[in-house]
Amino acid sequence: MRVKRAVHAKKKRKKYLKAAKGYRGALSRRYKLAKQMYVRSKWYSYVGRKQKKRDMRKLWITRINIAARNEGLKYSELIHGLKLAGVSINRKMLSELAVNDPEAFKEYVKIAKEALAS
């Protein structure tokens, strides 16, 4: 018996065209191009989720470095001093303290300086 694929094929094409709504020009109207762009967009979103983690860590380190230099320490010295002192605080929390609670951040800098001195 012959299998007619019209219903399934139309459903499949419709899925990609619906997902490609908002793309410019032929990318939202032609099935082949819409499918290619849909696959590419999924790849970009996958890569973007990985890059987001890198970018956030860079931002935290930059913020910590600026705040630490205002207190007379480099970022690397601060992290090393905190490790020597046995303080386990992650970069995200340090960054939050540097921005929102400078007094608490100064306490961590003081702890790091004491650990480096001894």
Curated annotation (Swiss-Prot):
Taxonomic superkingdom: Bacteria
PANTHER family: 39S RIBOSOMAL PROTEIN L20
GO cellular component, as recorded: ribonucleoprotein complex; ribosome
UniProt keyword RNA-binding present: yes
Record-level GO BP terms: ribosomal large subunit assembly; translation
Family: Belongs to the bacterial ribosomal protein bL20 family.
Stored CDD domains: Ribosomal_L20
Pfam short name (any one): Ribosomal_L20
Gene that this sequence comes from: rplT
Keywords from the UniProt entry: Ribonucleoprotein, Ribosomal protein, RNA-binding, rRNA-binding
Classification of source organism: Bacteria, Thermotogati, Thermotogota, Thermotogae, Thermotogales
Protein name: Large ribosomal subunit protein bL20
UniProt-listed InterPro entries: Ribosomal_bL20 (IPR005813), RIBOSOMAL_L20_CS (IPR049946), Ribosomal_protein_bL20_C (IPR035566)
GO molecular function: rRNA binding; structural constituent of ribosome
